[in-house]
UniProtKB/Swiss-Prot annotation:
Classification via HAMAP family: Ribosomal_bL25, Ribosomal_bL25_CTC
Subunit structure: Part of the 50S ribosomal subunit; part of the 5S rRNA/L5/L18/L25 subcomplex. Contacts the 5S rRNA. Binds to the 5S rRNA independently of L5 and L18.
Classification lineage: Bacteria, Pseudomonadati, Pseudomonadota, Alphaproteobacteria, Rickettsiales
Pfam families listed in its UniProt record: Ribosomal_L25p (PF01386), Ribosomal_TL5_C (PF14693)
One BP term from GO: translation
Protein's name in the database: Large ribosomal subunit protein bL25
InterPro entries recorded: Rbsml_bL25/Gln-tRNA_synth_N (IPR020056), Ribosomal_bL25/Gln-tRNA_synth (IPR011035), Ribosomal_bL25_b-dom (IPR020057), Ribosomal_bL25_C (IPR037121), Ribosomal_bL25_long (IPR001021), Ribosomal_bL25_short (IPR020055), Ribosomal_L25_dom (IPR029751), Ribosomal_uL5_bac-type (IPR020930)
Amino acid sequence: MSGILELEAKSRTEFGTGAARALRREGRVPAIIYGAGKTPISISLKEKEITKYYRKPAFISQLINLTIDKKQYKVLPKAVELHPVTDIVRHVDFVFLEAKTQKMEVPIVYEGKERALGVKRGGYFNIIKRRVILLCDVNNIPRNVTIDVTNMPIGTSLKSSQVELPKGCSFITKKEFVLATIIGRRGVKTEIEGEQEVAEAIQ
């Protein structure tokens, strides 16, 4: 799980391009928090600190306790603007968290795809979904969904119903969908095709 990140921010009352430039000269980054029917709060963060955390894996799904003028708010990053050359964070949008669950887009890690049974037999691991949208307990937001695919043979599909999700998480849709397949390259028979040919030869 991603855990909770503790950050401190300052409220700000000056806006516009000039005010943003002045903040950046001071080593700070403008940001805003909104959502959950609350009045938006304009804030600033330490540039080096927020850039450091942004560069860590799965920052966009990171639950944050944000302290502003001695008040704490539970928030999630929503959008991050970067400098086009240096990739330093220039602006951050956060959303307030009030509900017990939150819809999150989470990356998928296909563990063992290079050594999957079907790949070893000449197949190609075809990724259909690189991210999935989950409904998560706000205290158990995962950095990713890890799926072991080492036992997948050629000609098979990995479906959502086969995936064990992290505790407190569920797919937002009950309709089954395919995340990945292993397809045979030209001249490589799938295991299903091979079994059919053996059966026909025996008859």
